[in-house]
Amino acid sequence: MSTVKRILLINGPNLNLLGLREPGHYGHHTLAQLVADLTVKATNLSVTLDHIQSNAEHELIDAIHQAHGNVDFIIINPAAFTHTSVAIRDALLGVAIPFIEVHLSNVHAREPFRHHSYLSDKAVGVICGLGPDGYEFALNAAVRRLQSES
């Protein structure tokens, strides 16, 4: 009997403002809608999806640390921490859980400071610019990867 795989969805700073903040870049979906839709899809794919959103870097790092031994895959939208956080990078490397980096907007079509990611070279993959669909694509890719490892 196989165990149900667990995926942790991490959303970084200001993503709690989805639906309000710069809808031209981020769309009109709220974070609650995005997580609810993804949770249904995860259930249909027979995996468990846990979620955290925080504007505090240390809370995201703590969640990554707590994922060790409890989570099989991470989907992370580090938001602004993408471009600044060596600490989140080190946490992900420390727990050695595979992860996909997701961004709602195309970070490469935006300000130059958004072009660099401290995570992308260590990610299984990076999805950007596809809005909420990017999360679904990441979920499907994570599940396929976990199934291929079983």
From Swiss-Prot:
Catalytic reaction annotation: 3-dehydroquinate = 3-dehydroshikimate + H2O
Site (Transition state stabilizer): 21
Annotated active site: 26, 103
Keywords per UniProt: Amino-acid biosynthesis, Aromatic amino acid biosynthesis, Lyase
Gene3D superfamilies: Dehydroquinase, class II
Gene Ontology biological process terms in this record: amino acid biosynthetic process; aromatic amino acid family biosynthetic process; chorismate biosynthetic process; quinate catabolic process
Keyword match Amino-acid biosynthesis: yes
Matches recorded under NCBIfam families: aroQ (TIGR01088), PRK05395.1-1 (NF003804), PRK05395.1-2 (NF003805), PRK05395.1-3 (NF003806), PRK05395.1-4 (NF003807)
Protein name, per record: 3-dehydroquinate dehydratase
Gene source species: Photobacterium profundum (strain SS9)
Gene: aroQ
